[in-house]
Every structure is written in structure tokens, then in C-alpha cells.
Amino acid sequence: MNAREAYEKSLWNSLPEKLRKEIEKCVEHGYMETYFFRSNYPDLFKNKFNIVQILKDLGYFAKIKTINFQDEEDTKLEISWNN
């Protein structure tokens, strides 16, 4: 394993396990994106900007959006990638 691969593995392992498993499952099934809402996964949003930066460093497209759904506000973490 070269230095870049070791760095990427370290970054990947620094992400919450729940997030890693969801991305792996989506890739396995051929999906090109996934998303998480703060209301369902509040622990993912504790360091949300750190998570977005790690995902970007790993080559994913990630962004945080505030959305309104049925008069309630929520925050959404969107993640997409190219295979």
C-alpha cells in the first residue's frame, strides 16, 4: 500500500461506521448517491463540515442543505459519486 492509499484508508476509517456502511451498500447496488437527514441521523451532524471535507478529499461530492418539508425544517447531507 502506498502513502496515498494509506492516507485514503485512514480518511475512510475516520468517517462514522453508519455512513461508511451506507455508502458501501449504495455502491454495491449501483446507486450513484445517498443522503442523510439530521432528524434521522443526528450523530452524523455533530462534525458535519469535517465529514463533508473528508468525503471531498476521498473524491465524493458532498454538501449540506437546509430543506423545508411539510412546514418543518431539516438539514440534509447529500453524497454522490462517479463509478
Where are the model-predicted features located?
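An N-terminal amphipathic alpha-helical segment
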Residues: 1-43
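C-terminal edge-of-domain segments
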Residues: 61-83
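Short, charge-rich amphipathic interface segments used for partner binding and complex assembly
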Residues: 43-66
